[in-house]
From Swiss-Prot:
Residues 329-334 are annotated as: Required for transcriptional activity and interaction with ctnnb1. Its main location: nucleus. InterPro entries: HMG_box_dom, HMG_box_dom_sf, Sox7/17/18_central, Sox_C, SRY-related_HMG-box_TF-like. This is Transcription factor Sox-17-alpha-A. The 9aaTAD motif is a transactivation domain present in a large number of yeast and animal transcription factors. It comes from Xenopus laevis (African clawed frog). Transcriptional activator. Binds to the DNA sequence 5'-AACAAT-3'. All of the sox17 proteins are required for embryonic endoderm development and gastrulation movements, and show some redundancy in function. In addition, the sox17 proteins have distinct but overlapping roles in later gut development. Acts downstream of vegt-signaling in endoderm differentiation to induce a range of endodermal genes both directly (including endodermin and dhh/chh) and indirectly. Also represses wnt-responsive genes to inhibit wnt/beta-catenin signaling.
Length: 380
């Protein structure tokens, strides 16, 4: 860049300052004499560089002006004087609209002037060839890429945590495992409770389960303790509540009435032991009303069925169960279902029906277990 004074004032200043040591010989040489000479050399170099750039600019041949450029040369100056606060881009837009609004008669003198300049340019530069300058698209593309990268980083920082990792540790809901000593029965509140989710995940919508976790308790062995699995008397989770009448009537019919009146505790033990296969197969083949009730209650978490099971067992007395016994219906379950519907041979109890007169209690139990096993298979 050329200095505003043209380089002349800097030379005069250097001469005046350098003459100070000559006039004041007693004080010695000035401290700033050497730096000023270096600054003067830098200014001379910058002046030489600006002169070279001017020569290069003058060496490049400009294109001849067209009609619009000839008209806008004076019109731009006039608009700039009228609107000094407007930007050059706004002035160019106004000039373009004004030029388009002109008629052909108004444009004719400027078109003729542009043609004269073109002919003059051809005469002055016969070997002229237009070489368009390369636009600096690389820098613009880099700027755009940097902008996109900043936007992407901002979005990633919004999704990721402060340490740059997805915070997925709290999504795995842990359960408190509890152990019970051998011989003790867990209480109704022994089922597991999930840990509370962190408060910053309240905005996420978690999927709603199709069924309650307690309804699938048979498939999960963690819901039972080892003594409860070994002993048949304790079954805290079952589907007995859906069809108590059918199961109780089938199991009570296995005992003769004379022995059932005297032995109440063996009947209860037999009911507890024989309900396991029925609970296993009854889950897949429930009656229509029970299945409808289960589907209706599937979306809601249900309390532990232990309290319901104990409540039903309290008000159901052995006398009420014995009143519902039907001998003929029980014989139908033993003989007819096993032979005709399922197509299986039933040789052991085919000729003798278990009664109170002809057979011990062991034969009755074997017949009942076989009937319950075959009745729960699907009739395919």
């Amino acid at each position: 860049m050329s200095s505003p004074d043209g380089g002349y004032a800097s030379d005069d200043q250097n001469q005046g300052k350098c003459s100070v040591p000559i006039m004041m010989t007693g004080l010695g040489q000035c401290q700033w004499a050497e730096p000023m000479t270096s600054l003067g050399e830098g200014k001379l170099k910058s002046d030489a560089g600006s002169a070279n750039s001017r020569s290069k600019a003058e060496a490049r041949i400009r294109r001849p002006m067209n009609a619009f450029m000839v008209w806008a040369k004076d019109e731009r100056k006039r608009l700039a004087q009228q609107n000094p606060d407007l930007h050059n881009a706004e002035l160019s837009k106004m000039l373009g609209k004004s030029w388009k609004s002109l008629t052909l008669a108004e444009k004719r003198p400027f078109v003729e002037e542009a043609e004269r300049l073109r002919v003059q340019h051809m005469q002055d530069h016969p070997n002229y060839k237009y070489r368009p300058r390369r636009r600096k698209q690389v820098k613009r593309m880099k700027r755009a890429e940097n902008g996109f990268m900043h936007m992407a980083e901002a979005q990633e920082s919004a999704v990721l945590g402060a340490d740059g990792r997805m915070c997925l540790e709290n999504f795995s809901l842990g359960y408190h495992e509890q152990t019970y000593p051998h011989g003790q029965v867990p209480q109704s509140s022994h089922y597991r409770e999930p840990q509370a989710v962190a408060p910053h995940y309240d905005g996420y919508s978690l999927p709603t389960p199709e069924s309650s976790p307690l309804d699938l308790a048979e498939a999960d062995p963690v819901f039972f303790t080892s003594p409860a699995q070994d002993e048949c008397q304790m079954m805290p989770y079952s589907y007995n509540g859906s069809y108590p009448h059918q199961q109780n009537s089938m199991l009570v019919r296995q005992m003769p009435q004379t022995e059932q009146m005297g032995q109440v505790s063996p009947v209860q033990g037999m009911m507890a032991c024989q309900s396991s296969p029925h609970m296993y197969y009854g889950q897949m083949y429930l009656p229509g009303s029970a299945r409808h009730h289960q589907l209706h209650q599937a979306g809601q978490p249900s309390p532990p069925p232990e309290a319901q099971q104990m409540g039903r067992a309290d008000h159901i007395q052995p006398a009420d169960m014995l009143a519902e016994v039907d001998r003929t219906e029980f014989e139908q379950y033993l003989s007819y279902v096993a032979k005709s519907d399922l197509g299986m041979h039933y040789h052991a109890q085919e000729s003798v029906v278990p009664t109170a007169d002809n057979g011990p209690i062991s034969s009755v139990l074997s017949d009942a277990s076989t009937a319950v096993y075959y009745c729960n298979y699907p009739s395919a």
